[in-house]
Curated annotation (Swiss-Prot):
This is DNA-directed RNA polymerase subunit alpha. Residues 245-330 are annotated as: Alpha C-terminal domain (alpha-CTD). It holds the Pfam family RNA_pol_A_bac. One of its GO terms (biological process) is DNA-templated transcription. Keywords: DNA-directed RNA polymerase, Nucleotidyltransferase, Transcription, Transferase. Residues 1-229 are annotated as: Alpha N-terminal domain (alpha-NTD). It is an enzyme of class 2 (transferase). It comes from Aster yellows witches'-broom phytoplasma (strain AYWB).
Length: 330
């Protein structure tokens, strides 16, 4: 039986990125794979990326969360709610990372996340985040413990680590650095899928770092399944070489390129029906085509650039692969 071959995406474009979000386009994908890949990435991004968060808090003079503190505007429960929203970035690769942070202050004063004393390797992404306000002459001493984790961990689970510690209050922890993920799939050339995925983080890591980490997690899981069979044919079934990706594009008809009417008609009148016949022409020959002006020529070059290649590079490399294939056949 002949091995099936799937087109593997060979183009990832970072459309837009800022410190808390990014949009990426992945193409080409086999029909149906846009949803398959997009959904898998989304689930991993939202549930499985590691992060750092506060797991417990100790406030001097406080034994439990259902109380108030003289001279402190917020009650303990409100202070805890505010602490949960502080975003940490930790420069430590160890899974068992743990650090205690202290906040010592005297009123009158407005306390924010920036009021904490930070050790090396720990950064607060939202230092202006409000915690509480102290009135005149009030001394306030608070210690929090931050750890690394995945997803959401409730106070009940965090409490296991602080048994018999008087005055230490376990809190809920949201470790995941990804706030939101959305994706859409469009049908493109040759009935292939184009996946656009948009990621919003809490600022602890860049969107492209989140995407790469999620992809790595998926690969690690699938590698376990791949190892069940050592048959070379199985590997070939799921992979695609760059040469085959080029040949896929060469086989496309120009109707599938979504060109402007002017450019499409110019190519058709010149007897050019496929990408393969188009790349056989030099740039000078293309420019000389009837009714094809500078704007249309630039559109054509942009179409090649969509696949990460300059027109001349594409011409040389694609034709080289075609010639090599012909040699192999003979």
């Amino acid at each position: 039986m002949k091995n099936l071959k799937f087109i593997k995406p060979f183009f990832v474009e970072e459309i837009d990125e800022n410190p808390i979000s990014g949009k990426f386009t992945i193409k080409p994908l086999e029909r149906g794979y846009g949803i398959t890949v997009g959904n898998a990435l989304r689930r991993v991004l939202l549930s499985s990326l590691p992060g750092a968060a506060i797991v417990n808090v100790k406030i001097q003079g406080v034994e439990q969360e259902f109380t108030t503190i003289p001279g402190v505007y917020e009650d303990v429960m409100t202070i805890i709610l505010n602490l949960k929203k502080i975003v940490f970035a930790v420069d430590d690769e160890s899974d068992d990372f743990e650090e205690k942070l202290e906040l010592i202050a005297k009123g009158p004063q407005r306390l924010t996340a920036a009021s904490f004393e930070l050790p090396a390797g720990v950064k607060i992404i939202n230092p202006d985040h409000y915690i509480t306000t102290l009135s005149d002459d009030v001394c306030f001493h608070m210690t929090v413990t931050i750890k690394k984790g995945i997803g959401y961990v409730g106070a009940k689970e965090n409490k296991v680590h602080i048994e018999n510690q008087v005055g230490v209050i376990a809190i809920d922890s949201l470790f995941t650095p990804v706030v939101n993920v959305s994706y859409q799939v469009e049908k493109k050339l040759g009935n292939k899928d184009e996946l656009t995925i948009e990621i919003t983080t809490n600022g602890a890591l860049l969107a492209k770092e989140a995407l790469a980490t999620a992809a790595s997690i998926l690969v690690d899981h699938f590698n376990v399944l791949v190892e069940l069979s050592q048959k070379p044919a199985h590997v070939e079934f799921v992979s695609e070489s760059k040469k085959e990706a080029h040949n896929y594009v060469l086989d496309l008809e120009i109707e599938q390129l979504d060109l402007s009417v002017r450019l499409f008609n110019s190519l058709k009148r010149a007897g050019i029906d496929t990408v393969a016949s188009l790349v056989k022409l030099s740039e000078k020959e293309v420019v000389k085509l009837k009714s094809l002006g500078r704007k249309s020529f630039q559109e054509l070059k942009d179409k090649f650039l969509e696949y990460g290649l300059e027109f001349n590079d594409y011409l040389k490399e694609a034709l080289h692969h075609s010639v090599e294939e012909d040699k192999d056949k003979h």
